[in-house]
Amino acid sequence: MALDEQLLSMELPFFYKQVFVEQNQSLLSSVAMSLWSLFHVTGKPKVFFSLGRLSNSVIDMLEVYNETYSRDFLSSSSSEEIGALIIIDRNQDYHSSLLTPATYSGLLSEIFDINCANLDLNVKDTKYKKGKVDFCIEEAAATSKNTTMILDSTTDNLYGEIKHRHFSEVLSVLSSKAKLLKNEDIKALGIKEMKHFVATKLQQVTLYKQNLVNHVLACETIISEMSNKFENLKISETDMLNNRNKKLNFTFVDEHFGTDIHIYNSLRLMCLLSLTQGLSYEEYNTLVNKYLLAFGYKYLYVFNNLVNAGLLVQPSSLKLSLNISSLGNLSDRLPRWQSSFQAAANKLKQLPSQPDKVGSSSPSYVFNGGYIPLTAVLCNTILTSETLSEALTKLSPLTELKIGGNVVANLKDGMETLNEKLSNIKLNSELEFGCKDVKSMSKMLKSDPNLGNAFPLKPKSVLVYVIGGVNYAEIAACDVVQTAT
């Protein structure tokens, strides 16, 4: 389903729960078939990049379809519309899902309910208010008629102009648009001009005015809901990402659970702190108890689901959990340790050293200059690299990255078929059929750095497929990369 310009969705709301929480991978065949069907129309890209166990499985399924269901009408030539395919598991970059976005479209999704690009503009009973402990009066909200906004750039040009902008710029843009409408002097038109205006432009102007009113109302609601919290969230989230001020960060989250607890956003802060700086046994139990006291023990299963999905790291036991913060000033004298996330993020340059000085030309502006989404890093690297070897060198910190497509297909002359691989497979070995590990290709790349002649990428277009869903901030970051390249 097309939700917006250059944005497609399978619209399976239960997909994430089934695949990541319940560990049921039966829907991956639907993902592979959707790509298989698309390639019947566009042709296959020259090179595939997969990141994550689920993405690797999808690439393998595509290769099985190639061998089993190959038909004459599937073009064997490379696609003239898509230069490369990136498939990435959602759990490879959970941080982009947990951070508070700074773009207009991202904040819309924070405050309002959005379903298939239809936004419920209910300013009295927003999604944000529904998540508070003191729930709003539901009866009054149910009787009022709500406005529905369609977040589609093809039908709402104004939304297309402001959707990826930093929220601080949106009100000034809307103000300038309102002044332009006010300056139009319809009274000065003659009879013929008036008839022409009514026949051709009146409906468009009326719709434009309504869209303008809706966007102004949405902005006012965002400001009223987020104004007091946005700056503190920005500072704490940036410190978490850069592994700074662990004690202050936990205090901030702990106070949030005590005074301003939210059924969703509080869990996001807890998960972000857990993934970036870790939680001790005591800290973990403190936050869990406060959440259950606020919302009830019927939500105890939520924490088990978060652990299963990889969003939350549960400390094993009190004996094995080392609470560094309890050692007082000693923690300040210890050398700073880095988690695997921070080590990889620094190598990939995802954490700008000066977030406050980042402009809109950097993809990190979508998170207030604090973090560049992994999808944007992948796209930028693939679009700017001159050879395959250069691209893989830049992406070397991603240990789970694999390659498929024509680059691997050219190496299959005389290789085993899938049935031969299955018959010869050994216990505890990993089956690589549709994609190959980067390390296994390193020797070949030394003799031929541009193996398969896939780089520089032509055409310069990349299809990004996120298994588990993508958010508006990541889309905005990829849009910055598209503009720059």
Language-model regions, residue ranges each:
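Extended, well-folded catalytic/binding cores that form a central cleft or groove in large enzyme
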Residues: 1-485
